[in-house]
Every structure is written in structure tokens, then in C-alpha cells.
A protein has these predicted regions:
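Conserved N-terminal alpha-helix of the aminotransferase class I/II PLP-enzyme fold
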Residues: 64-99
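PLP-dependent class I/II
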Residues: 1-16, 26-29, 34, 38-56, ...
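A short acidic, glycine-rich active-site loop
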Residues: 60-64, 299
Length: 396
């Protein structure tokens, strides 16, 4: 019998395991560890959202929904998106409800890419981007952004990466793992490139409610989506969801907004793979969109306080750290210690029981940094920072 490992598809064999999950598994069952690793809110989903899911179950709403998702949810999404992103979509044909934003990402690449076609995206980046492109038989083309330039994606670098095989530009702002926010003037230049070269833009804006404006980061910042710029609505696929801002990670719910012909193509794949997102999750999402804004702002302000704490503590340790404009991550620079990001993270875990994620998990551009998530209780962050300070002091 041929060994089972030889039966695995070649393009799957080459996929690496998620660097985030590798470290998550190292801390499972260890009560002494303070995890700054997994990018998940420490807040429980607000009660009124959970109650909507419970009420849905009590009413016996346990069936399939339309492949596109409940029309009532798509109508609420359309209102929410128009208010937040300043761009309108037809809930009947231009919105697809998915099982998390990760599914939406998978669908858009499988719907749009032919084998060998290229997707340009910026690193450091979310760990799923490269594998999602590879699984759709596309070719990842990376642009390395740098802390010295505030992790800005420069349109000039995008233009230099465009070839006759380029089909998609993938954006993620605010960015995981850096918290960077793209300046509007660069978005405008990238939009002009998309029009000039007739490219589709896929924009993952899952963290857009979590912005930190003002000198102290406590004020809500202003988000601008590339989909709202002139000429971009009909060549953009806007991805968003409920996991981060609404603290609904376990509900596994996201959505894609795009012109009807693109939504239809994505839906055809979705109907054969997932069929639909869970009914009770969709009912909870309706409640989140209708009445969740105060809770989102309460959580955002709490993250802002933790952000400020972590920035202050890293500065006190002498660890250079970019000041994030959004999301809930810090990406301190650890290069001066002469360790790889994985070595640094493993030693910090072994010696001080603090879990962070090696920057290398987010692409080559992430090497030399580690990701620390501040979606963790303020008191735990204080303890983790004390431990980390002792660790870097020993490193000298």
C-alpha cells in the first residue's frame, strides 16, 4: 500500500501549519501561562446578542437558510455597511453571508483566480492569506512593509509588482498583526492603479470598528474603505464580519459585499461547500447590527486603555514598538537581542510563561518582531508586562 502521506495533494503537502495555532497548542492546559497570542476578544459576546441566539433556538429556528443568508440579515448588513463604509449594496443580490471572513476569503479567490494568476498583498499579514491563494491555485506576490515607514503599503511598490498575470490586490487595514492604518492618499493611488490595470481589489476590513484616534487613542478614529473611492465599488470585494468588534468569534459569521456577478460566483461555491451559515448565528447577528453599537464602543475604549498600557510598558523596557492605529495587536521589535522571533517567543514562554506569536508566522517581513494581543484583561497584561520586562532585562 502506498504510504498515506504520499496520497496527500501536492499543493496541500506544501502548506505550513499556522504559526499562531502552533503556539496556541503549546499553552493549552497550562494555567500558569498568560497568553497574548490568539487574536480573540476576551469579552464574552454581549448578552443581548447571545439572547437573540437563544430565542432563535427556543422558537425552533434550526433550519437551513437561503444560500446567500437570511434576507433580513442581509438588509441589516446593507444598512450597516452604508453607514460605516459610505457605499451601498443591494441586499438581494450583492451580499453573501459566510461562515466567518475566512470562508469569504477562500470563496473570492476560488471564484476569481485561474491557475497561475497572481494576487498582490502586503506583509506582515494574517496567516491565512498565502494558503488561501495557494489553495485556489493562485500565485502569492508579497510586498514587504516596514516599521520604519509605519507599515504603509506604498502604491509605487504595488505598481512595481503588477504583471500581466496580476488579477487581485488584497488589502487588510487595520492590519493584523501590526495595527497599521493605510493613509487615504495611498488608498487613492492604489485605487487608481486598480482602475488603470483593470484589477479587482479584495479588502479585508474586519477590524475597522476598532480604531484609536486622538493623541491618547481613546477617540474613535475615522475609517475609509477603498470600496468608497471613485470608480472602486464595482471592482472591489469588501469582506467584513462579527468576530472582532462584536466579540462573536464562536458564532463564525462573516460576509462579502460585491457586484452581483461576483457574489453569484462566490455563492455557487458556497452552496456546495457550506450551503449556509448557521441560522442561530445569523439571528444573533441581526441583533448585533441593530443594537450592538454601544457595546462595541465600550469594548473599543477598553482596548484603547490596554493599548496605551502596553505601549508605555514596551517603551519602559526599551523595546521599540509601532503605535497601532487599529485592531488589538502590538508588534514590538526584538532584533537587538540577536534571537529569531521564534527563539524569542519560545524562551519567553519557557522562562516567564508568557505567550506571544513569532513575527515570522506573518511572513518574512514579520521576522524580528513578535505579536502581542491586547484583547486580554488589563490586570493580566500588567502581569505579562512585568514578566516580559524581567525577561528582556536578562537578555541585556
Amino acid at each position: 500500500m502506498k504510504p498515506l502521506q504520499d496520497r496527500i495533494a501536492h499543493h496541500v503537502r506544501s502548506l505550513p501549519r499556522s504559526g499562531i495555532r502552533d503556539f496556541f497548542e503549546l499553552v493549552v492546559g497550562r494555567d500558569d501561562v498568560i497568553s497574548l497570542g490568539v487574536g480573540e476578544p476576551d469579552f464574552c459576546s454581549p448578552w443581548h446578542i447571545r439572547e437573540a441566539a437563544i430565542f432563535s433556538l427556543e422558537k425552533g429556528q434550526t433550519s437551513y437558510t437561503s444560500n446567500l443568508g437570511l434576507l433580513s440579515l442581509r438588509q441589516e448588513i446593507a444598512k450597516y455597511v452604508e453607514g460605516l463604509f459610505k457605499v451601498g449594496y443591494d441586499p438581494a443580490s450583492e451580499i453573501l453571508v459566510t461562515v466567518g471572513v475566512s470562508e469569504a476569503l477562500d470563496l473570492v479567490f476560488r471564484a476569481l483566480l485561474n491557475p497561475g494568476e497572481e494576487v498582490i498583498y502586503h506583509e506582515p499579514c494574517y496567516v491565512s492569506y498565502n494558503p488561501s491563494i495557494v489553495l485556489a491555485y493562485g500565485k502569492p506576490v508579497t510586498i514587504q512593509t516596514k516599521v520604519e515607514d509605519n507599515f504603509v503599503l506604498r502604491a509605487a511598490d504595488v505598481e512595481a509588482a503588477i504583471t500581466d498575470k496580476t488579477r487581485i490586490i488584497l488589502l487588510n487595514f487595520p492590519t493584523n498583526p501590526t495595527g497599521a492604518v493605510e493613509p487615504v492618499e495611498e488608498l487613492e493611488k492604489i485605487a487608481a492603479l486598480a482602475v488603470k490595470h483593470d484589477l479587482i481589489v479584495v479588502t479585508d476590513e474586519i477590524y475597522c470598528e476598532l480604531l484609536y484616534g486622538g493623541s491618547d487613542g481613546m477617540s474613535p478614529g475615522e475609517h475609509v474603505s477603498i470600496a468608497s473611492l471613485p470608480g472602486m465599488r464595482d471592482r472591489t470585494v469588501l469582506l467584513h464580519g462579527f468576530s472582532k468588534a462584536f466579540a462573536m468569534t464562536g458564532f463564525r459569521l462573516g460576509y462579502a459585499c460585491a457586484p452581483a456577478v461576483l457574489t453569484e460566483a462566490m455563492m455557487k461555491i458556497h452552496q456546495y461547500s457550506m450551503l449556509c451559515a448557521p441560522m442561530m448565528s445569523q439571528q444573533a447577528a441581526i441583533e448585533a447590527l441593530k443594537n450592538g453599537a454601544p457595546e462595541v464602543e465600550r469594548m473599543r475604549r477598553s482596548y484603547a486603555q490596554r493599548r496605551n498600557l502596553m505601549l508605555k510598558r514596551f517603551a519602559g523596557m526599551g523595546l521599540p514598538c509601532f503605535s497601532p492605529g487599529g485592531a488589538f495587536y502590538m508588534f514590538p521589535d526584538i532584533r537587538k537581542y540577536g534571537l529569531t522571533s521564534k527563539e524569542f517567543a519560545l524562551r519567553l514562554l519557557e522562562e516567564e510563561s508568557v505567550a506571544v506569536v513569532p513575527g515570522s508566522a506573518f511572513g518574512e517581513a514579520g521576522e524580528g518582531s513578535v505579536r502581542a494581543c491586547y484583547a486580554t484583561a488589563y490586570e493580566k497584561i500588567e502581569i505579562a508586562m512585568d514578566r516580559m520586562a524581567a525577561f528582556v532585562k536578562r537578555l541585556g
